[in-house]
């Protein structure tokens, strides 16, 4: 506490106002002390340039165009903007007494009135409900705003006392009704509660932030977990976690697959390697120098506690090493581990994931031993033996996880029709995709014997209001023989315009013999029509 007040400098008077305000309320005083004690290191970015980028991001939501931001001079101007060049406003130097008091009062209000408050302790309340910020977002008086908006909604959806079911009902409602626009085009700090209350645009971070604001405003103990890299999808990812009444933790992300449910024992199926939790309290851990003091290693909550002694190369010196995972763009550091007597002490890792011990010199990561993986409680090393090469037929590069299955399920119900009239005033159904594709290359064998010149692909109707069912095709080819390897000549002659009016996703990309280009329609259920040049009997698609 003394350190925090010293760091406040001239702003110390504001923080002491809060402490004096609660001098006769021991519990709220301790809550204030918790926030002030852990305030050093927290801060946010507030700048007119951030508002300019947000204006571009708003447009995607206002135009309801889905996962792309509309092209504009504004968009091109800010595409390379990096917020980290801006000055950061330390909370300890700018926090007002009024803001902190309002945050504490509103937090205690919901804690005292909600039926699930009895499920968690005061310490849990301080870490899981009380914090006024998540990351580096601009500060808003968000608690009452979110409470007033979502408390009536929760009451209309659920009136019981089961905390898990209450979260499940509200999260599933968001899944069905919230329009979320995915974009990774801008490097921005956390967007903030007020912005996200109107515009859900960004990445998984913005969905988890929105959920934290909603559920904490209603008294639910909610936090955010993340991994830095997953071999399942080659990215980082974050999701929400609910602290259960039995002390356990329930992970969820409400924009996950269409059959998403908040329930005990659930998992998204992604490999995680190492898992970290976002915290308001600072932690003096071995990874603080890597990720900052506001992350806590919680891998053991997902995979149990474990420890393994892993061999390192003989030339490795020092008393510590880095633990990493391989990615196509280089190694991703996920932990720091001690070295003792020529071995690394690696603890709390996910079995079945390949890791790599690393050294770091001038910012360059280099292997410090063979890759390894834990299998059945033992360390398995991957040491190459070129005398035992084998040939493998690989159908997928990555496992078919639930979220990928959800993407591919949007093809279910799509129809392919044929006609000799380019405007399809009469047509015959050639094929209907009745099941979710399992991979990106699929063959279908029509039973029609008549020749037709024109083919039309139509995506399925949306399963729920915010579902994205636009045409998205990398390649659609037609064959006059089931044994033929050479497809019939075809040309996309008309269809819905490409998303964002981007020529890179125009209709010609659906039949250009390049699997890495694709047609992506701007509107829902936009069809695309192909001309086979003359009437043909289609035996294979």
Please give the residue ranges for each predicted region:
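Secondary-structure boundary elements
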Residues: 6, 10, 14-17, 24-200, ...
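Short amphipathic beta-strand segments in non-cytosolic proteins
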Residues: 319-337, 417-424
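Aromatic, loop-rich ligand-recognition surfaces of beta-strand-rich domains
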Residues: 388-429, 435-540
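Short Pro-Gly-centered beta-turn/loop motif in secreted/extracellular proteins
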Residues: 343-356, 360-363, 449
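Structured interaction patches on ligand/partner-binding surfaces of diverse proteins
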Residues: 361-387, 469
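A short, amphipathic beta-strand motif
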Residues: 305-314
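Hydrophobic/aromatic-rich core segments of domains that either
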Residues: 2-9, 21, 152, 156-173, ...
């Amino acid at each position: 506490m003394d350190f925090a007040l010293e760091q406040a400098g001239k702003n110390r008077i504001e923080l002491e106002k809060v402490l004096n305000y609660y001098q006769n309320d021991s519990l709220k005083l301790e809550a204030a002390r918790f926030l002030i004690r852990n305030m050093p290191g927290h801060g946010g970015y507030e700048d007119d340039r951030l508002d300019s980028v947000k204006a571009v991001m708003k447009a995607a939501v206002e135009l309801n165009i889905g996962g792309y931001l509309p092209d504009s001079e504004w968009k091109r101007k800010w595409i390379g903007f990096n917020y980290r060049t801006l000055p950061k406003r330390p909370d300890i130097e700018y926090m007002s007494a009024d803001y902190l008091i309002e945050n504490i009062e509103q937090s205690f209000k919901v804690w005292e009135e909600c039926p699930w408050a009895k499920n968690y302790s005061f310490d849990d309340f301080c870490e899981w409900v009380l914090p006024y910020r998540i990351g580096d977002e601009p500060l808003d008086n968000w608690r009452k705003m979110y409470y007033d908006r979502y408390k009536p909604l929760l009451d209309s959806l659920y009136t019981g006392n089961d905390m898990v079911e209450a979260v499940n009902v509200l999260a599933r409602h968001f899944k069905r009704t919230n329009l979320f626009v995915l974009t990774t085009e801008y490097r921005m700090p956390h967007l903030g509660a007020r912005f996200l209350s109107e515009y859900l645009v960004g990445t998984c971070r913005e969905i988890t932030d929105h959920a934290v604001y909603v559920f904490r405003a209603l008294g639910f103990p909610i936090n955010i977990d993340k991994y830095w890299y997953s071999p399942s999808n080659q990215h980082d990812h974050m999701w929400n976690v609910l602290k259960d009444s039995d002390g356990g933790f329930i992970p969820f992300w409400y924009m996950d697959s269409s059959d998403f449910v908040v329930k005990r024992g659930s998992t998204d199926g992604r490999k995680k390697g190492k898992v970290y939790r976002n915290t308001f309290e600072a932690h003096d851990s071995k990874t603080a120098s890597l990720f900052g003091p506001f992350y806590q290693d919680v891998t053991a909550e997902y995979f149990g506690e474990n420890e393994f002694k892993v061999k390192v190369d003989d030339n490795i010196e020092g008393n510590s090493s880095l633990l990493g995972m391989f990615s196509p763009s280089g190694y991703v550091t996920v932990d720091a581990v001690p070295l003792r007597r020529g071995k690394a002490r690696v603890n709390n890792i996910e079995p079945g994931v390949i890791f790599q011990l690393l050294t770091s010199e001038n910012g360059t990561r280099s292997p410090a031993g063979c890759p390894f993986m834990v299998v059945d409680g033992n360390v398995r090393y991957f040491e190459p033996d070129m005398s035992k090469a084998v040939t493998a037929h690989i159908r997928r590069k990555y496992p078919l996880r639930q979220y990928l299955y959800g993407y591919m399920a949007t093809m279910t119900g799509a129809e392919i029709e044929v006609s000799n009239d380019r405007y399809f005033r009469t047509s015959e159904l050639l094929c209907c995709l009745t099941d979710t594709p399992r991979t990106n290359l699929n063959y279908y064998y029509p039973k029609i014997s008549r020749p037709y010149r024109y083919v039309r692909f139509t995506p399925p109707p949306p399963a729920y209001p915010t579902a994205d069912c636009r045409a998205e095709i990398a390649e659609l080819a037609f064959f006059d023989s089931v044994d033929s390897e050479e497809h019939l000549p075809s040309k996309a002659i008309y269809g819905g315009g490409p998303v964002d009016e981007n020529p890179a996703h125009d209709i010609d990309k659906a039949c250009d013999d390049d699997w890495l280009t694709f047609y992506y329609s701007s509107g829902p259920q936009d069809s695309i029509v192909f001309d086979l040049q003359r009437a043909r009997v289609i035996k294979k698609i």
